[in-house]
Amino acid sequence: MMKQYIYLTLTLVLGLTLASCSKDQLCERSVLPPVSEQQSELDRWCQEHITRPYQAEVIYRWDRNHAERSTHTYPPRLEQVRPVLEALEATVLNLYRDKQFFISSDFIPAHPLLRIYLYGGANRDGQGVDLLFNRKAPSIELYIYNVDTFSPTNPVEVYRLVRSAQHQIGRHLMTIHPYDHDRFLSLGPDRYSSTTEPFADAYRSYEKSGRLREGLGLNRYAYSRGFYSILGMLGAREDLAEMYSVTLTETPAAITRAEQDAAIPDDADGDEEAKRRYAEEAKIAHETFVQKRAFLSKYIEEAWRIPLQRLQLQSLQLMNQYLDKHHATQP
């Protein structure tokens, strides 16, 4: 008798639940956001142009589980997703499908990126520093920020996109083909910081003064300390990936100028003690820069079996072709 009573009760509850659901307009009131026709078309484009050829899932819808808690990221505007991915393919992804460089099965797409995440805004940490990459993410994931401000006619935005992507792909390939971490770390271990706090003011000063491109790449603050970029100061892993990324977005002449300028001491304004200290710091910075440059070149050629300068020139050519196509004034 008790079993019959429980059965009847469950049947009644289920019937009421179904009746209630039948009255709801699920297509309009679902807790999940509806997929619009625009999104569906965009999904098809992403599948055809990115996922199939590169085996990487494109994720542009908001997922709070993949946003760093200390940042202020948000989802991109839909109309910006395709232009950014088109630029990414033209300036970065195509490089890794070029058979004259990557004929080995060890490279992309044999070891593809798993996912590409897109965010509308910057990836600012607690110090207000706009990071080009997600430090906590696995190397098989690519994070693209500042999607909403991207414009194919803005060379600085194109540069930032390429710098970010090349850093992350470089780190991915360095995971596949390990380098001598201890040897690289020995070239300048006392210069690294686990947070952006020591250099946050310097980094933001470039952005605030309208010199974003300089702040992201080669600048005196960085190379006078033996680095290719300010963000390279975050650690050896970030440093080598930054060196790779900067190399692929700067000319050989620009890197040589930075190397030479690193040897020039800061002005001591007549202070003899400061003059001696600055001279010693410049000597160390120059030596460190030279040693790091040689390390990266040797590692790429031996582990990847590709001359770094050939990759550099091809990367610059792809960037210039994209900028020329969109009639942008090249930086």
Each model region followed by its residue ranges:
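Second-shell loop/turn segments in exported
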Residues: 70-78, 147-156, 160, 226-234
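Acidic/polar, low-complexity intrinsically disordered N-terminal segments immediately downstream
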Residues: 22-106, 291-331
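Surface-exposed patches in mature extracellular/periplasmic domains of secreted proteins
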Residues: 95-119, 176-185, 254-264, 307-315
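Auxiliary, metal-adjacent structural segments of Zn-dependent hydrolase domains
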Residues: 26, 82-142
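Bacterial N-terminal signal peptides that target proteins for export
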Residues: 1-9
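Active-site recognition of the HExxH zinc-binding catalytic motif
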Residues: 155-184, 190, 241
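Metalloprotease/metallohydrolase-associated module, dominated by Zn2+-dependent proteases
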Residues: 193-265, 269-304, 308, 317-331
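C-terminal motif of bacterial Sec signal peptides marking the signal peptidase cleavage site
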Residues: 16-20
